[in-house]
Amino acid sequence: MKFRSLFLSALCGLAVSTAFTSCSDDKYDPFEYGSNVALPEHRGLVLNEGSFQKNNASIAFFDAVMDTTTKAANDLYLIQNKKQLGDTGQDLIVEDNNIYVSVYGSSYVAKLNKAGIEQARKSFGSDLGQPRYLAECDGFIYVTTYGGYVVKLNANDLSEAGKVKVGPAAERIDEENGILYVACGSTLDGQPDKRMFIIDTKNFTDAATKSVDVCDNTQIVCATDNYVFIQGYGADWTNTPLWVYDIKSGKPEDTGEYATYVIEGENDNKAFAVFSKTDWETYETINTYFVYDASTKTKTDVTSKITSAASALANATIYSLSEGENGSFYITTSLYSAGNGTVYHFDSNYKLLGSFTSWGQSPKKVVVM
């Protein structure tokens, strides 16, 4: 025990040099939950998608208070489980101090404890299709698959508790007030789809499942109390339309705007979005950032606020948007196989709070614990 005490003291000194603040709480054990590495008390996680079929998906950790990460590369899943996460990290959510991750290429969903140590795993065979995105509601994890299902898993042990049939290429899923909203895109072999499925978690059956036609090749759904913001790749994969579904009236509407990624904004009527447009002759990308208010059907351009704080975000390859705490949000950029991505953290007033490496290729999702 004396050795451990000395080791922790030394570790606190090291944490200062890496800007971690966890050691400020004498009661906090940076090795809690059986961790093999010292972890900051208030931490964030970055899911790096990696490169397809390269088995290099990873989860990196960072100090969510200071927006700092380690000086040397960190791969939390590898450190804790002594094996690679797998091929193509798809989605990551946190619920009740547990981490749930879907790995598309490796065809499984795993439950990790707060330290990132695997507790349970659900493999997906050809009958269900490969897993895509995740949502949680009332003790269950809901998984979309490329077999055309939303699969219901018990959050404790990932045992299967049911499934409903949706479109063949089910993509993002979001939950609001016990209702699941599911985007269904076009299939890899070109079969078109433009439906958003609506599923009541209290009546999780094929018969009760509904759908509504929205934009072509639907990809993203972002649900609030009042609206669902919907993004698609469009019929030709070039212009990426932004639609809004009014939950009360049950009517979808094309906003006339384009978006590449979208997340919930500062209230239940607003979404924050980015539209990335690339000129394939010059390979120059121009990013436009905006807030869309569904209640007033108005767009507010905030590009200058974002790019004045982080000039790289004017032309970088944007890979994801993620919601943070207290109205903050994360923007990630990718260099694909050329190097690590970068994470940018902004507050609700578009002030840059910090930026740091993702320690992996193509950061797909950021969450805070």
Range-by-range predicted roles:
Residues S24, Y28, T68-Q84, G116-G125, ...:
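A short beta-strand motif characteristic of beta-propeller blades
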Residues E32-G34, G86-I93, L128-D138, P168-N177, ...:
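Repeated scaffold domains used in trafficking and secretory/extracellular systems
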Residues R43-L47, N98-S102, F140-V143, I179-A183, ...:
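Conserved beta-propeller blade signature
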Residues G50-K54, S106-Y108, G148-Y149, S186-Q191, ...:
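Short glycine/acidic-enriched loop and turn motifs that connect beta-strands
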Residues K54-D138:
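Post-signal peptide N-terminal segment of secreted/secretory-pathway proteins
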Residues T342-Y344, S348-M369:
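Blade-level signature of beta-propeller repeat domains, shared across WD40, Kelch, NHL, RCC1
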